[in-house]
Curated annotation (Swiss-Prot):
Protein name, entry field: (1R,4R,5S)-(-)-guaia-6,10(14)-diene synthase
One example of a Gene Ontology biological process annotation: terpenoid biosynthetic process
Domain comment quoted from the record: The Asp-Asp-Xaa-Xaa-Asp (DDXXD) motif is important for the catalytic activity, presumably through binding to Mg(2+).
Positions of short motif DDXXD motif: 134-138
């Protein structure tokens, strides 16, 4: 996911291709991996002589230089969220333990440090859904099945539109069940069921719209896989596809809900407001492509900007440097768009400022989460080392790919 994003934005598998259409198959799939580094032979490359040392750009500059805040409900919500998703997919103890390390609640906690426990739980559960759902298209059975991908999205759309059958925790489609509970919750106030004013029809339409953008990106990704065009695209075409398939758009709007932000239509529909969403999605995916580079090499994931630029003739270090330039350009684009935004009036501008805070927190949370959980590294300690030294160590035999 995102999309969030795994060079694959989904970090819930180790690359084994297993269908996940039924509860039993989800359990089989989930037993194979998780959201953290899980390669038994990784430690054999401790000798730096066997490693290519890559220098990363400063990923904590500009908008990312601010300190992060953690939601005070984090600990209690994490325990409940971890237990619930493990129960729904009927996971074994090994997967449940690994899932705790993935810590989707920490990610949600940085995204929305001031939201209610109900909203934080919903955001954490949305993360679990998004990564499970995305795996099917990323490295799973739908990655090269265009008709199957379109069909699964159609069934999920029916849930969002309220025309699908009611699923249960014992359903043969646990991923759909999770999404249905999310739709139920997002229609309510972020304070809880019947605890406040329900979401407006206007907001729910925006929430559906953001998910449609995500699904369009997934279909484009699968089509690219089927056509074998992963490395023949230019950077702009790649960004256009990945900013959708990353899953950042619906995650961002989900965080708007967590804060009770309901943008007026003239604000939500303004091209510069959408441009800021595009810019931050680009920033998130480009950062992700650097940090996920080794994992993507291991799993054979092609949708990665570093790999794309290497296919164009750049060395690995040159490609990473170029992605760093693209990230810095995101900040320039952001400030340019911000300077050109009109004033909409007191109430609308207050909502807009909340939206801008959500955008910044989303990018910062995604960055911190990657280091803290060992998402792409062999441990939290290794993630801390990479952050401190900005050195990414890649086995030379792998770096040649």
């Amino acid at each position: 996911m995102v999309k969030f994003d795994s060079g694959s934005e989904s970090e819930m598998t180790n690359g084994d291709e297993v269908h996940i259409n039924t509860k039993h198959e989800v359990k089989s799939r989930m037993a194979n991996g998780n959201g953290v580094h899980n390669v038994p032979d990784h430690d054999q490359f401790q000798d730096r002589a066997e490693m290519e040392v890559l220098i990363l750009p400063d990923l904590f500059s500009s908008l990312m230089s601010v300190p992060a805040r953690e939601n005070p409900h984090y600990a209690s919500v994490k325990a409940d969220a971890d237990e619930w998703i493990s129960s729904v997919i009927n996971a074994d103890a090994k997967w449940a333990s690994r899932n705790k390390r993935v810590d989707f609640t920490y990610l949600a906690s940085i995204w929305a440090p001031d939201c209610s426990a109900f909203a934080l739980r919903t955001s954490a559960d949305w993360n679990s859904w998004a990564f499970l759902f995305d795996d099917q298209f990323d490295e799973g059975h739908l990655s090269n099945d265009l008709d199957g991908a379109i069909n699964e999205i159609a069934r999920t759309r029916e849930i969002m539109e309220g025309t699908a059958p009611r699923y249960t925790a014992d359903s043969e489609h646990p991923i759909r069940y999770v999404f249905q509970t999310l739709c139920d919750r997002v229609k309510q106030s972020p304070e809880g069921f019947y605890a406040g004013k329900p979401s407006s029809d206007r907001f729910y339409r925006r929430w559906m719209w953001a998910h449609e953008l995500y699904w369009e990106g997934l279909v484009a990704q699968v089509r690219t896989n089927v056509e074998g065009r992963s490395f023949t695209r230019g950077p702009e075409e790649y960004l256009a596809m990945r900013r959708g398939s990353l899953g950042a758009y619906p995650a961002l709007v989900n965080n708007e809900w967590a804060y009770g932000i309901d943008l007026p239509e003239d604000v939500a529909d303004h091209p510069l407001v959408f441009e800021i969403m595009v810019i931050m999605s680009d920033q998130i995916l480009l950062v992700n492509d650097i940090l996920s580079y080794e994992k993507d090499l291991r799993l054979g994931v092609d949708h990665n900007m570093v790999r794309l630029l290497k296919a164009k003739g750049l060395s690995t270090q040159q490609a990473i440097n170029e992605v760093g330039v693209m990230i810095n350009n995101c900040y320039r684009r952001y400030y340019r768009a911000l300077s050109e935004l009109p004033c909409f009036g007191e109430e609308a501008d207050r909502a807009l400022l909340g939206y801008l805070e959500v955008e910044k927190n989303h990018a910062l949370g995604s960055l911190l989460w990657s280091y803290k959980t060992g998402r792409y590294f062999k441990s939290k300690e290794d993630g801390a080392r990479v952050r401190k030294t900005r050195e990414l160590l890649i086995p030379k035999k792998m770096a040649a790919l």
